[in-house]
Amino acid sequence: MGPWTLLLLHLPLVVSMLPAPTNVSIVSFNLEHTLTWLPGPETPDNTHFTVQSLRKNSWQLVKGCARLKTRQSCDLTNTFKDPFYHYKARVQAITTTQKSNRSLSMLFYPLTDTLLGPPVVSVSGCGNCPLLQVTPPTSRGLQRSLSPTQLYYRQFTCKVRRTRDGSQFSMWVTSTEKTVIGYLEPGAEYCVTVTPSTSFNPHSVPSEPHCAFTSPTAANTVPVVLSVLCAFSLLVVLLCGIVVYSGRLLCMHKPLPKTLSSVPLCGG
């Protein structure tokens, strides 16, 4: 059997192959993992896709991902449970008569590759020293983790920005207790943004700015009180002077008794 005969025998197999899926990637947010891909060029409309994951050196079918349609994705959250383990996945296009080559994803490490979402932030006012409370978000993937607070949401970078001029400073906070933000200008608006901070995962999303006004400076009432007291004192002195002066006038116009009117005046 010549080489051309062998080539002709294998030609139908080559022609019957489906285009392999492209752009295979694992998207992870707060330990919720999803495998996505695009159909290969000229993939038939009746094509289904099947997903396998690598477990202990063997490929196994992912539950719920055996007959996916175009533009569907595969949920790997229940499959990639251990954040300290590394995983791979592959997808294959299938019809009733054809199959494609399998397309592999990149090596995935949940601990370092997942995107950490923003924490839950609350700011309660206490004058010029607002209280900041930071708690981890909730998700199906984080609930499966052994200790999401200790792993991912233990420390945070808090940026405090004054809206009037854009000046800002940063501080470290934890999720175990409330933090007092001190040394703020009275009567100014400040916005607080909190981002998860870990030494092993650089992928994180900051929270939305939480803005609040500090209390204005209390008015100094001492000068006002002193002014009122001075005015009142002057009024009292003025009234006393008027009373005394009026008494003297009355005494000057009052007629003398007859016994005194007969007494000659000095120099008279």
UniProtKB/Swiss-Prot annotation:
GO terms for cellular component: cytoplasm; membrane; plasma membrane. It comes from the Eukaryota. GO terms for biological process: type I interferon-mediated signaling pathway. Residues 18-114, 115-217 form the Fibronectin type-III domain. The chain crosses the membrane at residues 224-244. The keyword DNA damage does not apply. Residues 245-268 are cytoplasmic. Residues 1-16 form the signal peptide. Disulfide bonds join 65-74, 191-211. GO terms for molecular function: type I interferon receptor activity. InterPro entries: FN3_dom (IPR003961), FN3_sf (IPR036116), Ig-like_fold (IPR013783), Interferon/interleukin_rcp_dom (IPR015373), Type-II_Cytokine-TF_Rcpt (IPR050650). Induction: In the fibroblastic RTG-2 cell line, induced by polyinosine-polycytidylic acid (poly(I:C)), a synthetic analog of dsRNA, that binds TLR3. Pfam families: Interfer-bind (PF09294), Tissue_fac (PF01108). Together with IFNAR1, forms the heterodimeric receptor for type I interferons (including interferons alpha, beta, epsilon, omega and kappa). Type I interferon binding activates the JAK-STAT signaling cascade, resulting in transcriptional activation or repression of interferon-regulated genes that encode the effectors of the interferon response. Mechanistically, type I interferon-binding brings the IFNAR1 and IFNAR2 subunits into close proximity with one another, driving their associated Janus kinases (JAKs) (TYK2 bound to IFNAR1 and JAK1 bound to IFNAR2) to cross-phosphorylate one another. Belongs to the type II cytokine receptor family. This is Interferon alpha/beta receptor 2. It comes from Oncorhynchus mykiss (Rainbow trout).
